[in-house]
Amino acid sequence: TKAVKYGKGFRVSGSKVFTSNSPDADIFLIYVRYHEGINGIGSVIMDTSMLGFSKGKSSKYTNGEEWCALYFDNVYIPEDNVLLGPGGFKKQISGFNAERIGNSARSLALGEFAFNVAKEYALTREQFGKKICEFQGIQWKFSEMKIQIEAGRLLLYRAAINADKGFPS
């Protein structure tokens, strides 16, 4: 998504694809590229009523949260709507470190839930006169799943401790 200087503001063209809760939102914080490189990224505030702004078809993530693509066709952004100019991106994303840890925790919880559902099934399902949890091949699968879950937990803990100490993501 590119922002080009136009009068006292900017013209923005491009798109954003995975924008959480976008079907219901009217105002958006949009990252734009003023020029190449990490120092060329900043952000603007955009309203759905702005000429050239449109939304795509609504879809859902696996957790049921809705999203839709956002399209910008030469949308004029007045200078009052420029939140961060070029170089502001580094400051703005520093707040995402905690969010990344939350996303990791959510994924770990989903993995644990799936493991427990599979375990209950293996403890009750019978095949050839035995519970399927008694078959060695099934036990290997459960061992591998548990190792992956615990490795994920340790990585999550390490990330949380390091983020609290101010280490970069």
Model-found features: residue ranges?
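Charged, glycine-rich active-site and insertion segments that engage polyanionic ligands
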Residues: 168-169
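Short, well-ordered loop/turn elements at secondary-structure boundaries
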Residues: 7, 24, 39-40, 66, ...
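Glycine-rich beta->alpha junctions and the first turn(s) of the following alpha-helix
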Residues: 53-151
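A structural signal for short hydrophobic beta-strand segments in well-ordered beta-sheet cores
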Residues: 3-4
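A short core secondary-structure module
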Residues: 13-54
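Active-site pocket-lining segment
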Residues: 143-165
